[in-house]
C-alpha cells in the first residue's frame, strides 16, 4: 500500500502512540481525519508483515464514501481491505460466514469504525463482531468520543479489543462495579469512572477539533413560524388526548405522545383513537403548510449549496418535489435509506456538481459523508437524538472547510419544537426530561401541560368545558 496524502500533526501523534500496541482506540472528533490514521497503521502492519488482510466494519450508509476516501489517500482500490456494514452483521448469515472464514484463514486487522454502533452487548451485531475479534491479533476502534451516553458504552467496545484492558469477562461484572440503577432499571449514575479512564488511557488517542484544526466557526439561527389556527387547535387536541395517559414507567406512552405531536407539527392529521397512531396529510396542497412556506422563504435568493435535514420521508418527498417544480429538475436530490446505494451515490455526485440542495434524513446522511464543499445546513425538522444531530452538523464542519458554517433550525412557536431544541442545546435526552417532568408534576396539570405548549392549561380546560356544553347549560352558567 502506498499513501499519497500527507498527515496533519495531530494525525502523526495518533499514529506514533497507536503503532506501538496491537489494539487501540482512536477517539477523534468528526472531521479530524481518523480514516487517514487508520490507513497509516494498516500500512505499518503490512510493511512489517504482521497482517495480510483488513476487515473494516462501518455503518452501511458510509461504505461507498469510505471506499472513495481510501482511494483518495492511496490512489487506487485496495484488494487487501474488505469493507462490511456493521448493520449487515445483525442478520446476514452469508456476510458473517464470509468474514469468519477470512479471520480463520488470514492474519486480519479488524477495524470497527463508528464503534458506538456496537455499544449494546446484547445485540447480534456486537456478538458477531466479538466472535470475529477472537481470531484477530490486531484490532482498532474508531469513534468521535469514548462515550456518547454514559460509561456503560465502553464495555462492549473494549471487550472487542481485549477484555483484559477493563478487566471484566462479562457485562454483569462490569455493571456491578461501575453502574448504579434506579428502581426502574435505568442507569442512575456511573461509579469508579477514574478507574476506567486509567485503564483505557494507555491504549487510546483522543483529540477534539478545536485542539487541532483551525476551522471557521459555526453560527446558529432559529427561524420561528406559527401553525395555522386550525392546525394549532388540532395540536392542542392531540395533546389533550395523550398528555394524561403518560406513564413514566412506560416509555411507549411518552414516545407515542412525542411522535403524535411531531406529526401534527410536520403537517399531518393525527388520529389517536387507536393504539397505533394513524396519519394523513393535513393540507391538500403541501404549499399550504406553513412549515414548508417558511422553508421556501429561506431558500428564496439563497445561492449556497445547502443540506436540508428532515425527520420524515414524506417531508423529504414533498420538499424535493416542490423545489424541483419551482427551480428545475435535480435542483434538489434526496438522500435516504429507501434509495439503493447506487442511487444515493449518484445523488451525492449530483449534489457535488450541479444540484444545489441535498434533502436527507439524519439516520442516513449523518454518518461518514464528507460534504465540506457545502457550508449551509437547514434542519427542517429535528428528532431528540443529540448524537445524530452532532454527526449531521459535522458532515460539513471538518477538515477542508474554509467557510463559516451556518446552521438554521426551523421551529414552530409554542410547540414541542421549542422543547426539542432546548434539549439539543443542553445535550439532554428528551424522553428522560419528560419522565422527570411527569415525576415532578404528577398533580400539577398546568405545569405538565406547559411543557409542550405555552398555552395556559387552566384557561384551556375552561374553554373546553364551555365548548362542550350545549346552549341551555351555557345560559344557566351565565
Segments the model singles out, each with a brief description of its role:
Residues 35-40, 50-70, 148-153, 311-313:
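Conserved Walker A/P-loop ATP-binding site and its immediately adjacent core
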Residues 79-93, 350-367:
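Conserved two-lobed SF2 helicase motor
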Residues 307-309, 317-320, 324-365:
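Conserved helicase ATPase core of P-loop NTP-dependent helicases/translocases
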Residues 22-25, 29, 115, 122, ...:
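Interdomain linker/hinge connecting the two RecA-like lobes of the SF2 helicase core
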Residues 1-27:
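Conserved pre-motif I regulatory segment
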Residues 137-171, 212-239, 360-443:
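SF2 helicase/translocase ATPase core recognition
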Residues 61-81, 161-164, 326:
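Conserved helix-turn-beta segment of the N-terminal RecA-like "Helicase ATP-binding" lobe
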Residues 52-53, 72, 109, 126-211, ...:
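Conserved P-loop NTPase motor "coupling/switch" region that bridges the ATPase
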